[in-house]
Regions:
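Accessory RNA-recognition modules of RNA-modification enzymes
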Residues: 1-189
Length: 189
């Protein structure tokens, strides 16, 4: 469907054939962001979970996400469980962003609706160590980098390894396989 739609959109400009770059169906995204959803039971106890908006802008709670990389899939539940055990890490947590790589380097940005202090820094450092990730805390006009705000990536392009550094907040192609194919297409054409 998409291929035919795009051919029609470009039909006034070209009749050339399109080279199609295909993606995997699952476990292909190395970048993802999720809202945090707070749920209270009848006794006032709360739980937190990851959430997204569906097509109608309704909240969709999720406990897993099959399109993210296996490493992100593995870290998601562990991270949420550990955060939920520490009030300082959990308090007013609004969203979580993941930026991963093929080297299993993973940067997690925790976004809050409150100012982050020294107590948060100490617990975030412990969380980094327990989960083996890099953490950044963000809130309005604040960015707390616990160890560093970048990750290492290694891509094999035309049978040669290239090393990259991806920085938090910068653009990265979230689909590593598509990224490699796009770069190879440019180099080969």
């Amino acid at each position: 469907f998409k291929i035919q739609r795009e051919k029609e959109r470009f039909s006034n400009f070209t009749t050339m054939n399109f080279d199609i770059i295909k993606s995997e169906d699952k476990a292909f995204r190395n970048r993802a962001e999720f809202r945090i959803w707070w749920e209270n039971d009848e006794n006032g106890n709360h739980t937190i979970s990851y959430a997204m908006n569906d097509f109608n802008k309704n909240i969709l709670e999720i406990d897993s996400c099959q399109i993210v990389s296996p490493h992100i899939q593995e870290v998601m539940p562990k991270l949420l469980e550990l955060i939920s055990k520490e009030k300082e890490l959990e308090d007013k947590l609004f969203a979580v962003e993941f930026l991963g790589s093929t080297t299993n380097d993973l940067l997690v940005t925790l976004i809050y609706h409150r100012k982050l202090g020294e107590a948060w820094n100490i617990l975030a450092k412990e969380l980094e160590s327990k989960v083996n990730i890099k953490i950044i805390g963000r809130s309005r006009k604040q960015k707390q980098i616990i160890s560093e705000d970048l990750i290492s990536e290694k891509l094999n392009i035309n049978n040669k390894d290239y090393n990259f550094e991806y920085q938090e907040g910068g653009f990265t192609q979230p689909n590593t396989n598509v990224n490699i194919q796009m770069i190879e297409w440019v180099l080969n054409n």
